[in-house]
């Protein structure tokens, strides 16, 4: 089940209460990873570099000029707890920022605004079987769109290259 309640820990918690096994990650991992801002702050504790970000909720008072000054352009504005790059905007100037924030607020109660990290986009699946962790090969994500947006993900405007074309030492990390 895509999104809430399938990816945010709610369904997993319900299944745990009923003693029904399932094949996704558990409640904690699901809840943590569905909230981008909290997840990014958590993984920073392990030395993982993440984009600088600001999280706003509907009650937040914010200053567009201050956000622009803090994060610079371009930046991404997206629902903090959404997925699929839905209502995500790559903002290139201060003139686009307010509209991008409002678009994301139409989908969720909180919005994350992130600086951009330039580079190669990769994804990696992993799973656990009988207490053994298995990591799949890295896949490089290449799109002709400006970023890996909803249409790239769901309308086939993407090329996925496995293994990713990155140095072996980077893959090992």
What are these model-predicted stretches?
Residues 92-170:
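Phosphate-binding site of ATP-dependent enzymes
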Residues 24-25, 84-85, 159-162:
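Short small-residue beta-strand/loop micro-motif enriched in glycine and branched aliphatics
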Residues 7-11, 86-87, 123:
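Short glycine-/acidic-enriched loop or helix-start segments at secondary-structure transitions
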Residues 47, 168-173:
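ATP-dependent carboxylate activation and anion-phosphoryl transfer catalytic cores
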Residues 32-120:
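Active-site nucleotide/adenylate-binding loops and adjacent lid/helix of ATP-dependent enzymes
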Residues 1-54:
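Conserved N-proximal alpha/beta basic substrate-recognition cap immediately N-terminal to
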Residues 25-27, 87, 168-169:
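Short, contiguous strand/loop micro-motifs
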